[in-house]
Every structure is written in C-alpha cells, then in structure tokens.
Curated annotation (Swiss-Prot):
Region (Switch-II) location: 65-81
Chain sites annotated for binding GTP: 15-22, 65, 119-122, 147-149
Compartments it resides in: Nucleus
Gene this protein is translated from: GSP1
Cited Pfam families: Ras
GO cellular component, one term: nucleus
SUPFAM superfamilies assigned to the protein according to its UniProt record, in alphabetical order: P-loop containing nucleoside triphosphate hydrolases (SSF52540)
Stated name of the protein: GTP-binding nuclear protein GSP1/Ran
GO terms for MF: GTP binding; GTPase activity
GO terms, biological process: protein import into nucleus; ribosomal subunit export from nucleus
Length: 214
C-alpha cells in the first residue's frame, strides 16, 4: 500500500490583483495537477513539498478572481486548516483590507495558522513600508515579504505553516519544488534592507491607533 501523503487545505485570500494566482502558479507540479471546482469557482492546486520527515502536500484553494465581486462564500473556507492572506506592497488599500480577510477566515476556520504575505517587493515603488505592517503582530500571524514573479521567499510561508501543522519546529524542506523560472530579479541588497527594517519595526511597540500610520 502506498503511504498516504499528509494533505492540508490551505485557503489563499486577499484583494484581487495582489498576485495570489501568480504566486500559486509558480509551483509547476501544482499548476499541472490543479483541479477546478465549478460550484465554488475555485482552482485547487496540490503543492507538494519534500521534508526531512517525508512528503506533505498543501491543497491550495485559489479564488479565481471572485473576490473582485465581494466576499467569498463560506464553502471556500470550510475545513481550511491553514491560510495565507496576501496584499500588494505597492497598494496601501490592499493592506488596509487585510483585517477584513482575516475576519472572514477566522470566522469560519477559527484558530488556524495563518501567514500574512506582502507581495511584489520586487517593485521599486514600495508603498506599504515595514513600520506600517503591524497587523500580524496584533493577531499573532507570521509575516513575510515575498515576490511571486521572482520566486523570492516562495517557500517561507509553506515551511512556517508545515512546522505549525505538523507540530515540529525542526521540520525542513529537503528538496526545492520545481518552480517556474523567475520573470523578474529582486535586488538582493534591497531585500536585505527590507529584512532589517522589518526586524527593527518588530522591536518597536505597537501603535495604539490602528490606522494612524496608513
């Protein structure tokens, strides 16, 4: 008997145009094996990762653009075991809407591990700076800068979620999944600067007023 691969439903949410579909399509096997659920208008991408404890899989639910027409149906969230909320660092409104996505996610899925991702850090005109990204600290989420088009930090959200779901901080990915070739390059020095800014911002006390710095 082939051993069943542990599989987790991952709900991917965020405003339209933040790069969710671009992000999930980077994983080539998942893109090749995706399934469309017509009743919900959802594409499910099975993203496999090889870890030091064997293989595991995330069934990533992607909205196929429905969020542009308002909220998502509960069927999208039901049985979600983990989540990624995505915003676009070049668009302040997409960050401002993060609390709405978080609220919808936890209303149905309750206490699941969630990663907040700021996408498009390859774009020079960054609008949402490290010091304004505080929502994850208030809600105990993990945060990563990512760039879907360059594959920058692609694996980070999945590794963090896998460790939480399996309950083992020693879990590592031992082989990289096949990813689509980068369409853009990130500036390594700039990424390091962003990383330092994020670390410095995390050391600061949280602002009292939620929208004071938006």
């Amino acid at each position: 008997m082939a051993q069943e691969v542990p599989t987790f439903k991952l709900v991917l949410v965020g405003d339209g145009g933040t790069g969710k579909t671009t992000f999930v399509k980077r994983h080539l096997t998942g893109e090749f094996e995706k399934k469309y659920i017509a009743t919900l208008g959802v594409e499910v991408h099975p993203l496999g990762f090889h870890t030091n404890f064997g293989e595991l899989k995330f069934d990533v639910w992607d909205t196929a653009g429905q969020e542009k027409f308002g909220g998502l149906r509960d069927g999208y969230y039901i049985n979600g075991q983990c989540g990624i909320i995505m915003f676009d660092v070049t668009s302040r409104i997409t960050y401002k809407n993060v609390p709405n996505w978080h609220r919808d996610l936890v209303r149905v899925c309750e206490n699941i591990p969630i990663v907040l991702c700021g996408n498009k850090v390859d774009v020079k005109e960054r609008k949402v700076k490290a010091k304004t990204i505080t929502f994850h600290r208030k809600k105990n989420l993990q945060y990563y800068d990512i760039s879907a088009k360059s594959n920058y930090n692609f694996e980070k959200p999945f590794l963090w979620l896998a460790r939480k779901l399996v309950g083992n901080p020693q879990l590592e990915f031992v082989a990289s999944p096949a990813l689509a070739p980068p369409e853009v390059q990130v500036d390594a020095d700039l990424m390091q600067k962003y990383q330092q800014e994020m670390e410095q911002a995390t050391a600061l006390p949280l602002p009292d007023e939620d929208d004071a710095d938006l």
